[in-house]
């Protein structure tokens, strides 16, 4: 199951760029708890867009299943740059919640 979440990052001239996290989750049913939980974050991709910004190099991505499997957390640490030479360090956390039916929701 794939879900995406966007976050805004401020850059010069009162602009902001969009950092988008797209992740694929594996939810499984737990009979004793009578609900689904995230058992694995299969993949995570993080992109940046707006005002010519891009990653200076691929960001470091850390995937964690927390809160007993109710939440998938993607941590992103990287540097964005634009053609003018402006650079900015970006550190973001994206959280996704697994509802009782196994659907993945943005928090």
Question: How would you label these PLM feature ranges?
Answer:
Residues 1-107:
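Mature secreted bioactive peptide module from preproproteins
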């Amino acid at each position: 199951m794939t879900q995406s979440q966007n976050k805004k990052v401020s850059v010069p001239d009162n602009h902001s760029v969009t950092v988008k996290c797209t992740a694929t989750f594996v939810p499984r049913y737990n009979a004793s708890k009578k609900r689904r939980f995230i058992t694995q974050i299969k993949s995570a991709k993080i992109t940046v867009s707006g005002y010519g910004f891009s990653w200076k190099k691929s960001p470091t991505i850390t995937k964690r299943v927390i809160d007993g499997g109710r939440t998938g957390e993607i941590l992103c640490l990287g540097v964005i740059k634009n053609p003018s030479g402006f650079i900015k360090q970006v550190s973001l956390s994206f959280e996704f919640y697994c509802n009782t039916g196994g659907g993945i929701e943005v928090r």
